[in-house]
Amino acid sequence: MPFQYHVREMTAETSAEEFVTRFVRVEKFLPFCQQCGSYNTRWTCPPFDFDPMTIWRSYTGLRLYARILQADVPEQPLDVAVAALKQEKRLYRELLQRWERETPESQMLLAGTCDQCETCEKVQGHPCGRPELLRYSIEALGGDVEGCLQHYFHMPMLWGRDGKAPDYFVLVGGLLTK
């Protein structure tokens, strides 16, 4: 049976400077990235050959976007929910891409690692095969997604456990603006 849910969307506006002051701690979050299977295997994930702060400092505004998958039935199977989350991530990316196209000199920030290619070229030591699609996530650039979710959207991050999906999943990203 498919994951039974509905989608809620929320946005919040802040300055890039305020967001950095409150939520960006590159050195704090890098160890979490190092525990992930995408670390050093995707061009969108650390380690980088640049300082992530250069991206944050290149912009003045940030429109945060939360796409919430609210379960309609409690304790649904986690694997089914994760499959739905992957589908929603595609729709989420499409919206952020539209915002980026419509906003000159902006850069979208995605949720989680890039999934545009089945196998990232970084693994083979090659440049990104789709550089026009390469975008970083808030967390890859040292941002505290849980803290930002609580502060701007007044909701905690929930995690599945014991094979059961949480009451909701949230994809958090945004659009950096000049």
Describe each model-derived feature in a short phrase:
Residues F3-K178:
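Catalytic cores of enzyme domains
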